[in-house]
Curated annotation (Swiss-Prot):
The keyword Transmembrane applies. This is Kelch repeat-containing protein At3g27220. Pfam families: Kelch_4. The keyword Zinc-finger does not apply. GO terms for biological process: anaerobic respiration; cellular response to hypoxia. It is found in: Membrane. The chain crosses the membrane at residues 18-38. Keywords: Kelch repeat, Membrane, Repeat, Transmembrane, Transmembrane helix. PANTHER family: OS08G0128000 PROTEIN, PTHR46773. Signal peptide: none annotated. GO terms for cellular component: endosome; Golgi apparatus; Golgi medial cisterna; membrane; trans-Golgi network. It is a single-pass membrane protein. Kelch repeats lie at residues 123-170, 173-222, 224-275, 276-338, 341-394.
């Protein structure tokens, strides 16, 4: 008879093997732990090593949800900024607009930034301005719309401002009020002058009560009105409003105070239309001279742009009208009046919130005076600020200013003297 298997003995041997395995595993584990503790006491901790590359408790940074390619160092901002940089919001976008056919004309004799102009009949008088930040012009160039040629040039008075002028014409006499004298961010002058455009002679005119940079300037109801601008340090906002009676290039009385403008600042369009005085766009604050700089080197300061429209009527009270489609500045000479509408070309708008760079404007805006409504009626060949506009025989002209760096980069680039025209149809 065969013997039965001894199950109890087999189970006892298996238990002993398991206990031996656990024993040796435990000994090895204790050895590894001891070695690790010994080693860790003589070298930096893991977290300390990693902190060289990843700071501990680093601050949380809020970044808009956009393509990382547009977050670039300002000092290395490339010229091929992607299209979507310009479409973070409506303010920074190129507003959709009809494409216009542009014809390039004869360029101005010199490039100009912050130049100023007036149109008298078929002649566009272009005044002074920067050739570069280190050089300013002291002359007037004249363009003849009939011949489409630059036809004349003459000097301005030595004491007259070179940029940031207040300027207006009555159809013969050109009133030039205050402004900046010299290059970079030099100080302002209150000296004012009158040009007789028929004889090309200059006349003295009473100085403004205080010097101003780029004040809004117009002739309304027989009085020369000067409003806002920047104060003596170039950055502080001025709200002053003065007027003086004028006729045939002469002052008939003295400067007097008027109702201050509700929102001050420089670089605005100032228009008289339908017996109303309008002030459009502009900004608060501007670049100012760097402290102790012997050349008054321009230093960036905070600028707040706006597209607000203020109107003064027969009651001598300011009223707000609908604002521009987007904030816009540097448009002092960038407007014309045609078909009961104000047309404004180009300008500069709010700083880009990511790159912190200036954004130029490339649209053409129309403000209909009968309906008080704004529209975008076209696009310029490129974005440009401080352009100077004229209108003749159905054509809208613009010349000079500072253009962008290309179709996909709205930052300010080259100072130009180019002139273009397009047929206006509306």
């Amino acid at each position: 008879m065969a013997n039965k298997p001894d199950h109890h003995h087999h189970h006892h041997q298996s238990s002993r093997r398991l206990m031996l395995v656990l024993y040796f595993t435990s000994v090895l584990g204790i050895g590894f732990i001891a070695a690790f503790l010994c080693l860790s006491s003589s070298i930096p901790s893991v977290s300390a090593v990693f902190s060289i590359w990843v700071p501990v408790n680093r601050p949380e940074i809020q970044i808009p949800i956009i393509d990382s390619k547009i977050v670039q160092k300002r000092s290395k901002q490339s010229n091929d900024t992607k299209d979507h940089v310009r479409f973070l919001s409506a303010i920074f976008a190129d507003i959709p607009a009809p494409e216009l056919k542009w014809e390039e004309m004869e360029s101005a004799p010199v490039p100009r930034l912050d130049g100023y102009s007036v149109q008298i009949n078929n002649l566009l008088y272009v005044f002074s301005g920067y050739g570069s930040l280190d050089y300013v012009h002291s002359h007037v160039d004249v363009f003849n719309f009939t011949d489409n040629k630059w036809c004349d040039r003459f000097h301005t008075p030595k004491e007259m401002a070179n940029s940031h002028l207040g300027i207006v014409t009555d159809g013969r006499y050109v009133y030039v009020v205050s402004g900046q004298l010299g290059p970079q961010c030099r100080g302002p002058t209150s000296r004012s002058f009158v040009l007789d455009s028929f004889t090309k002679t200059w006349l003295e005119f009473p100085s403004l009560p205080a010097p101003r940079y780029a004040p809004a300037t117009q002739i309304w109801r027989g009085r020369l009105h000067v409003m806002g601008g920047s104060k003596e340090n170039r950055n502080a906002v001025a709200f002053d409003h003065w007027s003086i009676a004028v006729k045939d290039g002469k002052a008939l009385d003295e400067w007097r105070e008027e109702v201050p403008i509700p929102r001050g600042g420089p670089h605005r369009a100032c228009v008289v239309a339908n017996d109303k005085l309008l002030v459009i766009g502009g900004q608060e604050g501007d670049f100012m001279a760097k402290p102790n700089s012997p050349i008054f080197k321009c230093s960036r300061r905070r600028e707040i742009f706006n597209g607000e429209v203020y109107m003064m009527d027969e009651e001598m009270k300011w009223k707000m009208l609908p604002p521009m489609p987007k904030n816009n500045s540097h448009i002092e000479s960038a407007w014309i009046i045609v078909n009961n509408s104000i047309v404004i070309v180009g300008g500069t708008t709010d700083w880009h919130p990511v790159t912190k760079r200036l954004v130029l404007v490339g649209e053409i805006f129309r403000f209909q005076l009968d309906t008080l409504t704004w529209s975008v009626i076209g696009r310029l060949p490129y974005r440009v600020k401080t352009a100077m506009a004229g209108f003749w025989n159905g054509y809208l002209y613009f010349t000079s200013g500072q253009r962008d760096r290309g179709p996909d980069n709205p930052q300010p680039g080259k100072v130009i003297g180019e002139m273009w025209r397009t047929k206006l149809k509306f």
